[in-house]
């Protein structure tokens, strides 16, 4: 018989608001004496076809159809009666039960947002009762790993936004700083902050817009990626650092090209640049091999160390070409390509379509499946990047996941907007707790790069 203090006594879900002003699911999971843990679920703007289903109400009279009362009700009336009474340390058993209660391959019945809220809250409750921080509970109790050396993640900081995350003329979604030359997480955050403010002053001096996108980066109207990357080089240098893959600050891109892809024609169209007449109709349309050449050219001109979703999620042939041409010097990250799904990741490993996986807990919907995906990637020698979503909350669980599972990289927005900063502050707190046991890997986190 398990210890009664670990017995789940009550579960309640309710609507809260995310950083874009839309509802999302929160869940509280209670043990005895009123002890509880809470989790809030994020939401994406550009979503992959294979993502687990985020259940929305569709009632146009309420939150423009984006309410989540159906998902909340599924927690309170379907999940809670089955999970109440279970031991909160039985993470895998609870997650598998919720998956079976749903019964669909993509969690379409109950909603991944319903299932994930409970899954994360269960882990947080068990950690609390064990009197451990969540990252230690994940490693020691869920993974059964007693090692006591901890890898802090190198952050990817989104400083220029475009694509679906901003109302501007840039077709690519994210341009990011990576402080690879820092000696600690705290120093990485300081370097990133200084470069961020340096970029802001440069944009102002050039009379460019300093409004922010969903993830806290700037959203100026620029002609192309070259302009954005030149500004980033200037910002790093003005802040007193050296841009470079082997220097202080490297760059990462997330163009989110699935948003640009025409599956029938198998071409990519730079729609924003075309609409703004920055590119001609001929130059705005590219084939897979053209895109790979384009990325190759940018990587030769700028210190780009990582490209996420450089091709569309269904363009596996294109990804194989990209890995062949760029994979030894650039981290090729699959986001929409894999949707944090362990089965798809394993197929991708066998076909060599990337060398890194983006990890978004709400793409798959349980902590157990998230861990399975990370384990599969690490076993193949691939890297993992734990990621936020464009619609976030002040929940900091992903910071603990990144440390607990030694992913070595995290992508959680810019140096503005408190729902992003919350994750950095949690990482600083973890690094302070760990002291000399914390290791910041810098460039060595990129295992595939020679």
From Swiss-Prot:
SUPFAM superfamilies: Enolase C-terminal domain-like, Enolase N-terminal domain-like. Keywords: Cytoplasm, Glycolysis, Lyase, Magnesium, Metal-binding, Secreted. GO terms for cellular component: cell surface; extracellular region; phosphopyruvate hydratase complex. Coiled coil: none annotated. Disulfide bonds: none annotated. The keyword Disulfide bond does not apply. Gene3D superfamilies: Enolase-like C-terminal domain, Enolase-like, N-terminal domain. It comes from the Bacteria. It catalyses: (2R)-2-phosphoglycerate = phosphoenolpyruvate + H2O. This is Enolase. The lineage of its organism: Bacteria, Bacillati, Mycoplasmatota, Mycoplasmoidales, Mycoplasmoidaceae.
């Amino acid at each position: 018989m398990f210890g009664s203090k670990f017995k789940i006594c009550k579960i309640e879900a309710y609507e809260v608001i995310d950083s874009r002003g839309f509802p999302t699911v929160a869940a509280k999971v209670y043990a005895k004496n009123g002890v509880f843990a809470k989790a809030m679920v994020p939401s994406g703007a550009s979503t992959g076809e294979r993502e687990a289903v985020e259940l929305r109400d569709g009632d146009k009279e309420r939150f423009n159809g984006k309410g989540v009362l159906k998902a909340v009700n599924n927690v309170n009336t379907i999940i809670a009666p089955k999970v109440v009474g279970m031991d909160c340390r039985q993470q895998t058993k609870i997650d598998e039960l919720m998956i079976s209660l749903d019964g669909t391959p993509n969690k379409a019945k109950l909603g991944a947002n319903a299932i994930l809220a409970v899954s994360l809250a269960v882990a947080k409750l068990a950690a609390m009762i064990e009197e451990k921080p969540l990252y230690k509970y994940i490693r020691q109790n869920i993974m059964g790993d007693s090692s006591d050396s901890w890898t802090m993640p190198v952050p990817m900081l989104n400083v220029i936004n475009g694509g679906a995350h901003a109302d501007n003329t840039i077709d690519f979604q994210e341009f990011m700083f990576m402080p690879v030359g820092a000696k600690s997480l705290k120093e990485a955050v300081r370097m990133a902050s200084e470069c961020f403010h340096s970029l802001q002053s440069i944009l102002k001096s050039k009379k460019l817009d300093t409004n922010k996108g969903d993830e806290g980066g700037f959203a100026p109207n620029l002609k192309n990626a070259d302009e954005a990357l030149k500004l980033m080089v200037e910002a790093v240098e003005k802040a007193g650092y050296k841009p470079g893959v082997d220097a202080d600050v490297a760059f990462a891109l997330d163009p989110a090209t699935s948003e640009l892809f025409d599956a029938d024609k198998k071409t990519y169209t730079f729609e924003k640049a075309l609409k703004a007449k920055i590119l001609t109709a001929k130059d705005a349309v590219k084939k897979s091999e053209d895109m790979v050449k384009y990325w190759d050219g940018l990587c030769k001109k700028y210190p780009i160390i990582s490209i996420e979703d450089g091709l569309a999620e269904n363009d596996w042939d294109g990804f194989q070409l990209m890995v062949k041409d760029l994979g030894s010097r650039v981290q090729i990250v699959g986001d929409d390509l894999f949707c944090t799904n362990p089965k798809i990741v394993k197929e991708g490993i066998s076909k060599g379509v990337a060398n890194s996986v983006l990890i978004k807990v709400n793409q798959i919907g349980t902590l157990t499946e998230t861990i399975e995906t990370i384990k599969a990637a690490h076993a193949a020698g691939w890297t993992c990047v734990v990621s936020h979503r464009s619609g976030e909350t002040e929940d900091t669980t992903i910071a603990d996941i990144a440390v607990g599972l030694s992913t070595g990289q995290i992508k959680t927005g810019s140096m503005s907007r408190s729902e992003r900063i919350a994750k950095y502050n949690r990482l600083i707190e973890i690094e302070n707790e760990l002291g000399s046991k914390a290791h910041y890997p810098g460039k060595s986190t990129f295992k595939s790069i020679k």
